[in-house]
Amino acid sequence: YRSDSLEPLSVVSNRYKVVQPKDVLHFYKDLVSAGGFELETAGVLKGGRKLWALAKTGQEARIKGNDRIKAYLLLATSCDGTLCTTAQFTSVRVVCNNTLQLATRDSNGAVKVPHSTQFDPRQVKEALGIGFASWESFMTNLKQLSQRTVSPQEADSFIRTVLNEPELTEDNVQGSKMFQTVNSLYQGKGMGSELSSASGTAWGLVNAMTEYVDHHRRARNQDNRLDSAWFGQGALLKQKAFNQALTLLH
């Protein structure tokens, strides 16, 4: 329960290892200090059930000159068992604030500790050191995606595959509203879609999908949208888009 309002947050089993917010914040500060990071912002979701923080890593790269990508460390835990204590590297595209988990074929850039396991900050730090080593590989992938031009047919197929959208028929000549939104973001309505790195490229397709999830996908409120984009179905959809885009490189 919350100590300020005494509002119950959840009913958990006796195997559940409680991680107090103050302990997590101390760990966050210790971790960002050890890594030379800078804690930028923190907040809660779901009425205090989830606690999160973003730390700047200081890593930044540019794609085709003016498309800036920054690396952040996203730290989160829950008080109701719905989320493992998690530390994951996340990229932020400066022009639009789209977020994408820093992942490669060999690493997902995340460390997760179930609440049934004793929280060991040292173990998390060591694992994160391995995850952060994938930054260069991740940026190499992004640059390759920005150089991969796609045809209108490939773009159409990509969006349909990621959204599980059926092919157009006589009865369905436009596609779903979701398909139309993502397609319009790719075609020029998306933030930064006019940049040479994104216009008509596989990187542009990825950003159309991440912008849709982060800023346009239907949600009851911004709290729910952010929760989904970072930890739920939205995060899975963005990762699916990224993985699908990588197949265009071969």
Regions found by a protein language model. Give the residues of each.
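N-terminal low-complexity, intrinsically disordered segments
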Residues: 1-45
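Residues at beta-strand starts and edge strands
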Residues: 24, 49-51, 69
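Long, contiguous hydrophobic alpha-helical segments, chiefly transmembrane helices and signal peptides
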Residues: 27-28, 55, 75
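Ser/Thr-rich, low-complexity intrinsically disordered terminal regions
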Residues: 34-63, 163, 167, 238
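Intrinsically disordered, low-complexity regions enriched in serine/threonine
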Residues: 59-250
